[in-house]
Regions:
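N-terminal Rossmann-like NAD(P)+-binding domain of SDR-like oxidoreductases, especially those catalyzing
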Residues: 1-78
């Protein structure tokens, strides 16, 4: 299975990403890493995801969900 998960560096998205990876899903994580709260915290979460034992199933796309062209490319590609 494959999922596109928005906000993958946020609190809920981070935990969902790890859970989906544990379930052997391919996760396309979308996040713009805005400064709503600590960018360092978000980057640390991404680092932890990339260290996950099934990290080969994780694809990160840095973009905003309000960027239609970028999201369209992601949906077409994956």
């Amino acid at each position: 299975m494959r999922v596109i998960l928005t906000g993958c560096a946020g609190f809920i998205g981070f935990h969902l990403t790890k859970k989906y990876l544990d379930m052997n899903f391919t996760v396309i994580g979308v996040d713009n890493l805005n400064n709503y709260y600590s960018k360092k915290l978000k980057k640390d979460r991404l680092t932890e995801i990339f260290k996950h034992k099934k990290n080969k199933n994780f694809i990160f796309c840095k973009t905003s969900i309000d960027n239609y062209k970028s999201l369209k490319k992601i949906f077409i590609k994956y």
